[in-house]
From Swiss-Prot:
Knocked-out gene: effects: No visible phenotype. Double mutants lacking both MWL1 and MWL2 exhibit smaller rosettes with a decrease in rosette fresh weight and stem height associated with a reduction in total lignin content and an increase in syringyl/guaiacyl (S/G) monomer ratio.
Signal peptide: 1-23
Residues linked to a glycan: N197, N213
Keywords: Cell membrane, Glycoprotein, Lignin biosynthesis, Membrane, Signal, Transmembrane, Transmembrane helix
PANTHER family linked to this entry: OS07G0462200 PROTEIN-RELATED (PTHR31769)
GO cellular component: membrane; plasma membrane
Function: Together with MWL1, contributes to secondary cell wall biology, specifically lignin biosynthesis.
InterPro entries, sorted: DEAL/Modifying_wall_lignin1/2, DESIGUAL
Main location: membrane
Extracellular side, ranges: 73-94, 159-217
Full protein name: Protein MODIFYING WALL LIGNIN-2
Amino acid sequence: MHNLFLYSVVFSLGLVSFITCFAAEFKRTQKEDIRWDTERNCYVPGSHAFGLGSAAVLCFCLAQIVGNIVVFRNHRTRTKREDGYKITDLTLPTVLLLLSWSNFVVVVLILSTAISMSRAQAYGEGWLDEDCYLVKDGVFAASGCLAILGLGALTISATRIKVKKQQQLVQVVIKDQNQDQRRSMEEEQKHDEHQTNKSESVIHLVEEVSSTNISRI
């Protein structure tokens, strides 16, 4: 139940990040917003994309953190036993986790750059080397799509670890049941052998006693 709540938090934060990225795409500074002075110095006013992009980055980072908490919980709470039971096949979850973190770094770098360009660029200062820069078409939208992709990979990784743990736990329970049955059968067999040996001993003693009595007669 606790993991379900964390999954819903990741989904909600990811959805907010996705929506704010697309909102920033429509609110970004356009070419016609650029102004020039008599010395051909450029000026770009700030746009709402700055605030929207900042909110998108914040939500995405929080979603990534919560998602990794779920992964850590699922991995840390795996069943450990005296016979050395542990989850060994984590290839797919590990690949998805690495993909998620690589995607996270790319998205944060792209959004951080786009957010920085969305601030006001004063005359004679610009954004870099006194030149003004604008965010290209589709940058915010693509970042939102990548954010959803990365969070999806992270969620699948956490779910896969959980499912793998449950599957191996079932296998261990079945193995224990088989071992108990085998042990019970061995004990019954030993008991039967003991009874058989005991019966044979009694028969042998009776035969000896009978033989002795006959000899005396």
